[in-house]
């Protein structure tokens, strides 16, 4: 049975607060553990393009640092938006919290607090949330989930052109048990302002280990004819040479779908004005948007992903679309992913044409 949920705990912290803000939030979002280390800090809501050296430089201005680590995705190498800074002197750590917590960096307002010691209980606590109301803000998302535990990071995916929410978000809890409780309490429920129930699940739960292994092969496998995006950055091939190699040698026999042509069809479709649309065919019935984000994200800026689902079963109909802002990045993604085996299926990836499947 669907249940209409009430708002969670409220907090008077704002995303656009001053450089130093008061932590007056009573929810677990900003709770610290006074019994833990007084030198090790966790820094949340870092800009996606911030490097570890920049993080170290920022916090090194406060005092001498023993260690600094920007946490990255093990598969893609992309920043997860948070990191750890360990000072030598506890006084410097306290000063860093007082000085840098609430600092505005680009479009982010960072959060600095004492870190908990690493343990098995805090791993795999990242949740994938879909079906969110398009009007829901990141603060409201945190309020909804904060009743279940301490939130490390949160994110709502938005269209980079319009700025409108895609109705999809991520919540990373301090502990896995907190994430499990959030799934029990919120999955299939209706948050305030929603007309449909939301879906809450682990971003990388046990049932997705196969996909994770596949994606790992995509970026790391030495047996791939064409290296993944991380390896490509180290190659000295120009993009045009790579494309010539990718499509000059037939890697498999692509089927023709409704007259659809691949990039090898010579004619590249025109730019639609909002990005380059890529058609992805032969997806599995249980494929979802998160797989497309993980596959295409490392190649460049992705503004939209969409898996086309059957109206009656809500299962993937076998294809989807990915929109990227940059042509070269989109072409590179196609060169690497067209003909790639995802599970027991060989993907067909091409620029969308007028004859491509329609949603």
From Swiss-Prot:
Keywords: Phosphoprotein, Repeat, RNA-binding. The keyword Cytoplasm does not apply. Pfam families: RRM_1 (PF00076). InterPro entries: ELAD_HU_SF, HuB_RRM2, HuB_RRM3, Hud_Sxl_RNA, Nucleotide-bd_a/b_plait_sf, RBD_domain_sf, RRM_dom. It comes from the Eukaryota. One of its GO terms (molecular function) is mRNA 3'-UTR binding. Disulfide bonds: none annotated. GO terms for biological process: regulation of DNA-templated transcription. One of its GO terms (cellular component) is ribonucleoprotein complex. Residues 39-117, 125-205, 276-354 form the RRM domain. The modification Phosphoserine is found at residue 221. Residues 1-33 are annotated as: Disordered. Brain; neural-specific. RNA-binding protein that binds to the 3' untranslated region (3'UTR) of target mRNAs. Seems to recognize a GAAA motif. Can bind to its own 3'UTR, the FOS 3'UTR and the ID 3'UTR. Interacts with IGF2BP1. Interacts with MAP1B light chain LC1. Belongs to the RRM elav family. This is ELAV-like protein 2. It comes from Homo sapiens. The lineage of its organism: Eukaryota, Metazoa, Chordata, Craniata, Vertebrata.
């Amino acid at each position: 049975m669907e249940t209409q949920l009430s708002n969670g705990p409220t907090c008077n912290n704002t995303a656009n607060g001053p450089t130093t803000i008061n932590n007056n939030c009573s929810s677990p979002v900003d709770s610290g553990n006074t019994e833990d280390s007084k030198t090790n800090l966790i820094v949340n809501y870092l800009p996606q393009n911030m490097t570890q050296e920049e993080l170290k430089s920022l916090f090194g201005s406060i005092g001498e640092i023993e260690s600094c680590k920007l946490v990255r995705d093990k598969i893609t190498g992309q920043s997860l938006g948070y990191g750890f800074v360990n000072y030598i002197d506890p006084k410097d750590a306290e000063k860093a919290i007082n000085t840098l917590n609430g600092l505005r960096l680009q479009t982010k307002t960072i959060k600095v607090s004492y870190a908990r010691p690493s343990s098995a209980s805090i791993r795999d606590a990242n949740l994938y949330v879909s079906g969110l109301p398009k009007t829901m803000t990141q603060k409201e998302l945190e309020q909804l989930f904060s009743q279940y535990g301490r939130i490390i990071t949160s994110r709502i995916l938005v269209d980079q052109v319009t700025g409108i929410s895609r109705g999809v978000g991520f919540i990373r809890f301090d502990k896995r048990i907190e994430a499990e409780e959030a799934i029990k309490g919120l999955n299939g429920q209706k948050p305030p302002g929603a007309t449909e129930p939301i879906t809450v699940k682990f971003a990388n739960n046990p049932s997705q280990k196969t996909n994770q292994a596949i994606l790992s092969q995509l970026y790391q496998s030495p047996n791939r004819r064409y290296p993944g995006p991380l390896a490509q950055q180290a190659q000295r091939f120009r993009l045009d040479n790579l494309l010539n190699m990718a499509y000059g040698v037939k890697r498999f026999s692509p089927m023709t779908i409704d007259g659809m042509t691949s990039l090898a069809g010579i004619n590249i479709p025109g730019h639609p004005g909002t990005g380059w649309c890529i058609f992805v065919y032969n997806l599995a019935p249980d494929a979802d948007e998160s797989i497309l984000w993980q596959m295409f994200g490392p190649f460049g800026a992705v503004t939209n992903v969409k898996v086309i689902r059957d109206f009656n079963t809500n299962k993937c109909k076998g294809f989807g679309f990915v929109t990227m802002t940059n042509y070269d990045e989109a072409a590179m993604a196609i060169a690497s992913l067209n003909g790639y085996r995802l599970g027991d299926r060989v993907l067909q990836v091409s620029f969308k044409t007028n004859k491509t499947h329609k949603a």
